Amino acid sequence: MTLYVDTSSLVKLYVTEAGSDVVHKLVSDAAVVATSVVAYAETRAALARLRREGALTGSRLTTARRTFEEQWPMYLTLDATDSLCRAAGELAEKYSLRGFDSIHLASFAEVARRAGTHNTRFSSVDDRLNQAAQKLTRTLERTGQK
């Protein structure tokens, strides 16, 4: 199974918080874990924000960042190409998504087209984004883009 993770799920791999165990299980069950290249900057920003807000100590931030840096090359990363960003723009309008969420959804769609919707799962903490991914999966299946 190929698992696509957005940044909210990716962060849960490096910071223990509610839902981390679920994401760890999904990742351990996946043959491939994919994400957008934009998740790198988003994850680093999220870790820094958690430190600023006091949710992470300095040493926990250092450990999380080091582990993330070591594991980043293991992810299948999708580039935010012009065509992918244009598709993301369409998805943002269709599903009322924020910009980076729509990039994650467009990246997931690309992964699902390559691996097949039957063999691809989407993971996010964001309910709206999860619902959009479910609707998009049904559309891809219905139109034969699986």
Predicted regions mapped to residue ranges:
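Short beta-strand scaffold positions
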Residues: V5, T35, D79, G99-S102, ...
